[in-house]
A protein has these predicted regions:
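Transmembrane alpha-helical segments of polytopic membrane transport and secretion proteins
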Residues: 1-27, 247-263
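Periplasmic/extracellular loop-to-transmembrane helix junction in inner-membrane transport proteins
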Residues: 38-81
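C-terminal transmembrane helix and the adjacent membrane-cytosol boundary/short C-terminal tail
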Residues: 98, 189, 233-263
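Generic hydrophobic transmembrane alpha-helix motif, especially the helices
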Residues: 109-144, 151-152
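Transmembrane alpha-helices
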Residues: 135, 139, 172-204, 233
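Short cytoplasmic-facing helical segments at TM-TM junctions of multi-pass membrane proteins
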Residues: 151-187, 219
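Non-cytoplasmic
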Residues: 190-240
Length: 263
């Protein structure tokens, strides 16, 4: 008991220590940014942190800020969730059918190797610009989810599966108690990787397609009018939204898996 308490305290102390170091690291790079801005003395080249924060607060309290955030958030997250669902389905299907895996392989290879800009320009011909970010986000996430889930299923411990077969454990219980826990690390890893990708690709699609009322439109206008503080402020907004959504989504997934395994 005493040993457990000491370990918990040590972990807490380490967590506090590293949290402090992370904060100092952020402050260090903000200071470098400020000094670089002061040295250049041209906001058009590098806006200072102070002007960016000021602009950020102006945006937050402006009328159409939340509309733009909502517009992009709904579409990019929709693309991500659709890719997750289809990626899991295709991975399970490919695991049970080699023919399906062979059929899917060329498509996954093409999507992986084709530049995002090429897809965006091609898709502008077929898809309205307001829905372009949905499809591009979906396209960038699908191969990552599919590949990781398929690999996770393949790496499931064969001895455990043989034991389940010997004791005649039905497929539903195998999925619940064996496959879910074995595949979860691969799924979480895929989500961490693809969440950043989907936001970068989705916003890039909006910058090129320029749908009205999107974050991409705001970035495009900031570039056209050489409004560097605006550009930095919207970039920070994208980073924060992406970070918060990632933490929330992964937390929900972990909670759902825990409930499934311990129900």
């Amino acid at each position: 008991m005493m040993h457990s308490i000491i370990n918990d305290r040590a972990k807490t102390d380490n967590g506090t220590k590293y949290a402090g170091i992370r904060i100092l690291a952020v402050l260090f790079w903000i200071a470098i940014w400020q000094f670089a801005s002061m040295y250049l003395k041209q906001e058009i080249l590098l806006a200072s942190p102070v002007s960016v924060v000021r602009k950020l607060f102006e945006l937050i309290f402006s009328g159409n800020f939340w509309q733009s955030v909502g517009f992009s958030f709904v579409r990019i997250v929709t693309g991500f969730l659709l890719a997750v669902l289809l990626g899991i389905f295709l991975a399970v299907w490919a695991y049970w059918s080699k023919t399906v895996e062979i059929l899917i392989a060329p498509v996954i290879a093409v999507v992986k190797s084709t530049p995002v800009a090429s897809f965006i320009i091609l898709c502008l011909i077929w898809i309205p610009s307001k829905n372009l970010s949905v499809f591009i986000s979906f396209l960038m996430v699908l191969p990552v989810i599919y590949t990781n889930i398929l690999e996770g299923i393949r790496q499931t411990d064969r001895k455990i599966l043989e034991m389940a077969k010997v004791f005649r454990v039905n497929l539903r219980r195998q999925i619940r108690y064996i496959y879910v826990s074995q595949v979860l690390p691969y799924f979480l890893s895929a989500c961490r990787l693809s969440l950043g990708m989907c936001w970068k690709a989705g916003v890039a699609a909006e910058v090129i397609g320029v749908p009205s009322g999107s974050i991409g439109e705001k970035l495009y206008n900031a570039k056209i009018y050489l409004n560097t503080p605006d550009l930095f402020a919207w970039t920070i907004v994208i980073i924060v939204i992406s970070f918060v959504f990632e933490k929330c989504f992964l937390g929900i997934v972990s909670r759902v898996v825990y409930m499934i395994e311990h129900r």
